[in-house]
Amino acid sequence: MAGSNYSGSSSDEHVKVTSQRKQGFLERLGETTGGMLVGLMAFLLSFYLLFTNEGRCVTTQNTLDEGLSLVTSLNDVFTPLPQNDGKLVHLSGSLMTLQPLFDPNYGISLHVVKLQRRVEMYQWVEYDDSRDYEENGEKKTETRYSYNTEWKPEVVKSKSFDREIGHKNPSSMAVESFISVAADVNVGNFHLSKGLIDKINTFKKIRLAKFESPHADIVIQDDYFYHSVNHRNPEVGDLRVSFHFAGLSGEWSFLGRPDVVTIVARQKENQLIPYQTQSGNILQLLYEESLSAVEVFEKEHAANSMLTWALRFAGWLLMFVSIKLMTKIFHTLVDWIPGIRDLVSLGLTVFGLCVATSLTLLTVAMGWIFYRPLVALLLGILAAVPILIARSRHRPKML
């Protein structure tokens, strides 16, 4: 039966201890059985993740190789040539927007691709630190709760606090955050598609030294608009607002020169739209710097390689965890024997590492077998190494 008690010397920190009866053998066995089912589903999912990741990797490589072999670099971004219609083109140039983006509530008006208003509210935040221990045959959890006031961009729900009294937050913000996006964005005389505009996401904070406070009760300090009686000693519920931009465009302004971007996309008259490759993938690339066509595709290959290895590791980790869940029942059977349970736990961990590594390499090999047979063969040989090592360690010694 569970119970709890509190202790603490201040309103901003307290300790809560919960206790419950130690589970019996049959209860632990029942939980382990449920874990086996979850482990089985995760085990199957890891195979799917690993196999499809290899297919995605090869398809992306083929797409990038095809794109590099077909791309045409444009030297003049102000004169779209008819002979390039339908082709994959590469160009670099400064961003241009036809109309400024503005926030009339704060007097902000700028020629940028994206204008972001970020609102933060001064609120109570709860922190907890727990430790488990056993006492008089009961399993107990001691949780230390502490509270602090901080600026947060989202409403912190104080109703979920362990102790809301004295730490209550407002349920909403009087001013909301938002992002405004320019409808028409050009590089030279080329109009960017929505997909290309979405890729412009390097935000920079706007310095407010050249702006004035829109209202008497709003103070500008440290590049924030403060909705506060005393911004140096704020109260819970006070707001502060900052502005950020991405894709500076137009002529020279106090923010600096317009940003330069590099684009690889399909030319359709004076529009830049997605390019459909023979492999079925879409090419629509944008980098917020000046790059050659070769540099663009090198960066894409590097990103593809990084994603591939990240998903391989995720698949291996998922497989290892699933094997641990499925074999935990063996540990449960002996967890009441102090010495044996530690040895079994170590053995199951080593077993899980070996099997997960071997099956991961085999799955990767199967994913590559139709594309790179030699690589698949090498991976198959490597996959057998952990199993052979594990078997050699457990092979009975001959007298």
Name each model-derived stretch.
Residues A2-K397:
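OB-fold and OB-like single-stranded nucleic-acid-recognition modules
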